[in-house]
């Protein structure tokens, strides 16, 4: 039976593929004829935002991407950074937002699967995962179902695959009611001489399909991920892929074994737009053409058309260019792991992307125009408006600061995430030194006595909404600060830029200014961006998400015996605030959660201060002077010391300092840390801080079972712990809504 690959190309069909009339005109001019149905699908997949970055490319080029430790920057499946001794860390963050809203379990699971593949396709064994999740307001009827599905999906895939989840974020805001965010991060370890790239080399060489069979799942997924949602969202369920972590585990082992055999010339995982994107990227990067014969593609469904095979996003698949003499050896490895291995085409020297099905040519397109020379836009953008200054004296005070602290520490955004991370395997592989719940996750580097890596993921979307430039800076600074607070040296970062519709100048303005802020902070902090992902059109019925440029970073600890945790303080220790007192309440959680206001500017990020204070803290930790360390962020000083008290199970008696109590307690000024140390060490730290020009203040002493701050706060650590640990399980059990 012959499967029909033809359909009439109508304006409706073109629009359904997300192609604008001018883009279709460009296709006609490029190929000099009407495209086939398969070709239309290929253009639609390769020219959408998800694959081409057409709206953001111009601005992404401005980011700092190189540094003394950077081995591979953006443009590959993941970034590669040197960690010494011939080892490198390979990492990236990527979104799976749209699929996770439609089908939370599979959407999140395949997001984890996709990012793990990005790491091991480079030749690295995954050693750590994180996920940054944003949901709608807790009261929204869908939120609990989405949280439950996404967390189960992330855990179900990561746990079965066997990678520890070491960190992440979970936040709630009504602006995510119609579009949740699932940003998945993975990191792996490799040797310098064992890094594999996706650039095809050599003509007439076999192109090999590896892994699971191809089905109809996920057809059109990349196109869906580049569109806004509306009322027809339920119809999009078939565009969500289905993942199998056990197949992926076999694929990992088979790929690493194959790489060790010397058979691999180039390798690319099949992610968005499946076979189309992986083949085009490999060919275009190597300035080669690719010919595919679809009759050789392993399929698990009958009568699949060329269009379906080319655009399927079935999971756990790879494409590779192979050394011909190694074919038998390569095939034996994949058969051993129970995976498909099929030669589905060859490299050519004519820069054409040719697809053959049932003996007929169903696509013949210029490969460069699909790949690195795809359309690029310089979209109009508007400078975001600025908030007027908001002095702390203009912000109302609360009558009862103890009650305010209990309310904030037990709020949806600041309470413990234990309910989430207890569903993840945080200890598998046996190298975890710090699990979620602190400033950064830390794992030992296998094969080294003392070396460890620290990981954090951060962004404060409400700051980005108020001021995308400062918000972009702050996301980088907080990630850098969290890594620093363990004693690690931040090495490099990856960005996951989640925004609304870039065709709206105000949204495009948010993206442009956030990238500017990120770039400025990365340059100032020597924290280059080595990989990343952009997710646009996160809007439903015209309502955009908060601008959310998530930054994930990796840091290096030369000796993990000199490492700080947030829960390490001991009775009798002195607590020291480094970096100055709180003054800034604009865009604070104090204003938002106690007064339901989003007023004032985001806090200013002084990058020179950030660097100086951070380097001071890091050296104190590495010199063994510190028993605990925590950076200040949401909720300021009061929340930071409350978390330290909860994690160490100890109280403290502190002096809030001179000034307005709400600003001293809850101000969100940046570049600040609280450390604990023995009284003798605290004196030395104070002396050193004075010499280094780092503002400091002795806060008080650790001890007892209550947290007392001046005359304002007096609350038991038990009550703090109950509020902190209670919100999430109670919410998931249906016992409460938003803010109680």
Swiss-Prot record:
**Active-site residue numbers:** 50, 96
One annotated GO biological process = 'de novo' IMP biosynthetic process
Pathway named in the protein's UniProt entry: Purine metabolism; IMP biosynthesis via de novo pathway; 5-amino-1-(5-phospho-D-ribosyl)imidazole from N(2)-formyl-N(1)-(5-phospho-D-ribosyl)glycinamide: step 1/2
Statement: the UniProt record of this protein carries the keyword Disulfide bond: no
Q: Which domain of life is it from?
A: Bacteria
Primary location: cytoplasm
Q: Which UniProt keywords apply?
A: ATP-binding, Cytoplasm, Ligase, Magnesium, Metal-binding, Nucleotide-binding, Purine biosynthesis
Q: What does the record give as EC number?
A: 6.3.5.3
Residues that bind substrate, according to the entry? Answer: 95-98, 117, 241, 313-315, 535
Identify the GO cellular component terms for this protein.
Answer: cytoplasm
Q: Where in the cell is it found?
A: Cytoplasm
Instruction: Identify the residues that bind Mg(2+) 2.
Output: 118, 269
User: What does the record note on quaternary structure?
Assistant: Monomer. Part of the FGAM synthase complex composed of 1 PurL, 1 PurQ and 2 PurS subunits.
Functional description taken from the UniProt entry = Part of the phosphoribosylformylglycinamidine synthase complex involved in the purines biosynthetic pathway. Catalyzes the ATP-dependent conversion of formylglycinamide ribonucleotide (FGAR) and glutamine to yield formylglycinamidine ribonucleotide (FGAM) and glutamate. The FGAM synthase complex is composed of three subunits. PurQ produces an ammonia molecule by converting glutamine to glutamate. PurL transfers the ammonia molecule to FGAR to form FGAM in an ATP-dependent manner.
Recorded family membership: Belongs to the FGAMS family.
Q: What is this protein called?
A: Phosphoribosylformylglycinamidine synthase subunit PurL
The record lists the organism as: Brucella canis (strain ATCC 23365 / NCTC 10854 / RM-666)
Annotated gene: purL
